[in-house]
Amino acid sequence: MLAKYSSTRDMLDADGDTTMSLHSQASATSQRPELGHTEHQRPSSAWRPVALILLTLCLVLLIGLAALGLVFFQFYQLSNTQQDSILQKEEKLGNLSRQLQSLRTQNRKLAETLHHVAEKLCRELYNKTGEHRCSPCPEKWKWHGDKCYQFYKESKSWQGCEYFCIAENSTMLKINTQEVLEFAMPQSYSEFFYSYWTGLSRNSSGKAWLWMDGTPYSSELFDVMIDLTSLRSRDCVTILNGKAFSKDCRELRRCACEKAAAMVKVQSLHEPLSRRWR
């Protein structure tokens, strides 16, 4: 009986152990998903700060882009404003430049008009007195047209007169217009046959007559009287008593020089005008 009880208890213990073992296995099986779920949730909690940081960086980047866009917009507006201002200034500068050019043109025209009036008045005074301080020519020089003339009493060869005129900052007399001819020929009248060298010459009898600057002589203005009895290697022209003669360039004749007239001395007109208006 004891043996039967003992075997029965052993069987119960064995069943209990089996039951406990099955319960333990079931408990372990039921607990594994919870551990897996716990392990699955841990990475999610770890990425939250990273995601928050990335979101913050994105917001900062968006704010920076917005600020950059605002700055670019302001710079664009400022650039357009400055460009408009530059265009306006360039337009004003162009208008001022045109006005200045117009004033310069008017000033030049006024100066030319003043010069013509002063020259006309000075010429009237000069023709009345034969000499005036307003004359654009040096002292003792004769004013005619736009040139100054001087007929010297010194006698020299043709080349000597050339050097003499150069020393006086002038050239030898050139008769190339009717006005100059009508002015110069009366200066050649002399009771003692003093003729004046001109700047007209030629190298030989077969060559053309040329003035000192290389321009040709015009026979329509005056004729040159040539002495055919004497042959020379070089001929030069003198004027005497309203006529032109071919002479040996080595002969001694008086010098006639010319130079361009300067500006009329306007300030020298004030004194005669004040006396004239009194």
UniProtKB/Swiss-Prot annotation:
Glycosylation sites: N95, N169
Annotated Gene Ontology cellular component terms: plasma membrane
Signal peptide annotation: none
Compartment list: Membrane
Chain intervals with Polar residues compositional bias: 18-32
Record-level Gene Ontology MF annotations: carbohydrate binding; transmembrane signaling receptor activity
Predominant cellular place of this UniProt entry's protein: membrane
Domain of life: Eukaryota
Extracellular domain ranges by topology: 74-278
Sequence ranges assigned to domain C-type lectin in this UniProt record: 144-258
Name the UniProt record assigns to this protein: C-type lectin domain family 1 member A
